[in-house]
Design a protein with these regions (language model features):
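Catalytic cores of the polymerase beta-like nucleotidyltransferase superfamily
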Residues: 4-197
Length: 197
């Protein structure tokens, strides 16, 4: 693609990661990563998927949120055409976080997606669609199969957002907070500790 567009100098700044089946091109301050279409399946006791080659449709179906299931056609006949089977562009414009498929399946398959929903809502100042949020509440105990490191990574992204309180309010309302940060949850309602407030 890079060579066909006459961007020879960019071609020199490409990286191929064969183990992951990805390639990356750097152009000025932009990094673009290319990944082949994949299909995933999960076992109930793990969030690590079994990954196989798949179609674009398979790949879009496995995405966490509609706003992350957008694709652009690179074929010559339809170059640049948006492929948006879940109306992700509408959700992007409306500021809504929603899963492309049944949210109970989405969050049960990969419980970290519950944290990602809250993180995206916090960072982007979006709202979480009602049924998607209800599914977070219903599946919250599945977060226990996620490593602390992955949870901390999402918490750090919430804390460094422009309004982290939004994330903590959503974590509290979804009842995820006592599961991932029981010490903070225990402080709820306390105005002073050791005379400090």
């Amino acid at each position: 693609l890079v060579r066909s567009r006459g961007l020879g100098d960019v071609y020199k700044r490409q990286s191929v990661f064969k183990n992951f089946g990805t390639a990356q091109v750097k152009y000025k301050d932009i990094e673009v990563e290319f990944v082949g279409a994949r299909r995933e399946s999960y076992t109930h006791d793990s969030r690590k998927p079994i990954v196989e080659d798949g179609t674009l449709c398979d790949d879009q179906n496995r995405r966490d949120f509609t706003i992350n299931a957008l694709a652009i056609c690179l074929n010559k006949e339809h170059f640049g055409e948006l492929i948006d089977p879940f109306n992700g562009m509408e959700d992007l414009k409306a500021g809504i976080i929603r899963t492309p498929l049944d949210p109970d399946i989405t969050f049960s398959d990969d419980p970290l997606r519950m944290m990602r929903a809250i993180r995206f809502a916090t960072q982007l100042e979006f709202s979480i669609e009602k049924e998607t949020f209800s599914a977070i509440e219903r599946n919250r105990k599945r977060i226990e199969i996620i490593s602390k490191e992955r949870i901390i990574d999402e918490l750090n992204k919430i804390v460094t957002s422009s309004k982290p309180s939004t994330g903590f309010i959503l974590l509290d309302k979804s009842k995820l907070l006592p599961l991932i940060f029981p010490e903070l949850n225990a402080l709820k309602g306390i105005e002073t500790i050791d005379g400090r407030g």
